[in-house]
């Protein structure tokens, strides 16, 4: 699939970063789904999570971009080789590459030169499970509890349905319009479907206004599969954001 416009833009600035490598954010990933999820991070690897289990991912210092997601219905042998019905990453438990569609993605760009983290939930490769991301910061400039908790799989248009999830139209049809290739692109009927289900998530590549979120550098994050974070900061941020609207 395509990538959000802001990631391409911010990543271009990262080329110019020089000097000391800065600590990347830590991500605490928790599975609240009533089934096992094989969490994945690139960079970061992978881990099997039963319901209620967590995994802390700390990318190497200097890491500028990454993706985190959940895999479903996986089977791995003792060497960590196998397959997943959704979110598979080259048949390995310890991910060393991107996910196979359909998959619900958390994407981040860490840019210390701007003193900002950029993060989002992307449905550009489709949807396989609900999730949320919550920054663990009380900084008022850190606005962005993002959720995509709709049961998209049960609502998925028949032509996009596959085992384990719901494909995006870009992955399914690979056309310029659906994949937002070229100088200008607009919503399609399919991207509107995803946006209606998850208003805070990317539904097409230039969906930046309502889908790109920032926090000051130094912020860590909680990602929850099938639920919201119950962290105290979630309530604080919700109150802060709504009081300022």
From Swiss-Prot:
Relate the induction remark in this record.
Answer: Strongly induced by arachidonic acid.
Q: Which Pfam families match?
A: Thaumatin (PF00314)
In which tissues does this protein get expressed?
Answer: Mostly expressed in strobili, and, to a lower extent, in roots of seedlings and saplings.
Q: Which GO terms describe its biological process?
A: defense response; response to arachidonate
Tell me which residues are glycosylated.
Answer: 90, 186
Extract the SMART domains matched here.
THN (SM00205)
Arranged from A to Z, the UniProt key words for this protein are: Allergen, Disulfide bond, Glycoprotein, Pathogenesis-related protein, Plant defense, Signal, Stress response
The question of whether RNA-binding is a record keyword is answered with: no
Highest taxon of source: Eukaryota
Q: InterPro entries per the record?
A: Osmotin/thaumatin-like_sf, Thaumatin
Q: Where is the signal peptide?
A: 1-19
Disulphide bonds in the chain:
33-226, 74-84, 89-95, 142-215, 148-198, 156-166, 170-179, 180-185
Q: Which PANTHER family match?
A: OS03G0233200 PROTEIN
Function according to Swiss-Prot or TrEMBL: May be involved in disease resistance.
Similarity remark: Belongs to the thaumatin family.
Q: What is this protein called?
A: Pathogenesis-related thaumatin-like protein 3.6
According to its UniProt entry, this protein's organism is Cryptomeria japonica
């Amino acid at each position: 699939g395509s990538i959000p416009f802001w990631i391409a833009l911010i990543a271009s600035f990262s080329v110019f970063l020089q000097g000391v490598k800065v600590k990347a954010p830590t991500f605490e990933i928790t599975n609240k789904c009533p089934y096992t999820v094989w969490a994945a991070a690139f960079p970061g690897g992978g881990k099997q999570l039963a319901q209620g289990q967590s995994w802390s991912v700390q990318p190497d210092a200097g890491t500028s971009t990454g993706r985190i997601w959940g895999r479903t219905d996986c089977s791995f042998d003792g060497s960590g080789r196998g397959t997943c019905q959704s979110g598979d990453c080259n048949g390995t438990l310890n991910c060393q590459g991107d996910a196979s569609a359909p998959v619900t993605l958390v994407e981040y760009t860490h840019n210390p030169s701007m003193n900002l983290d950029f993060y989002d939930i992307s449905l550009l490769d489709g949807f396989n499970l609900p999730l949320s991301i919550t920054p663990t910061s009380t900084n008022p400039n850190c606005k962005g509890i993002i959720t995509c908790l709709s049961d998209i799989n049960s609502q998925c248009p028949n032509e996009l349905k596959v085992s384990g999830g719901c494909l995006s139209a870009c992955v399914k049809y690979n056309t310029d319009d659906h994949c937002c290739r070229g100088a200008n692109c607009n919503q399609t009927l399919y991207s509107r479907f995803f946006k209606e289900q998850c208003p805070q998530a990317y539904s097409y590549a230039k969906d930046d206004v309502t889908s790109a979120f920032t926090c000051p550098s130094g912020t860590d994050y909680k990602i929850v599969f099938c639920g919201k974070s119950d962290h105290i900061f979630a309530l604080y941020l919700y109150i802060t954001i709504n009081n300022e609207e």
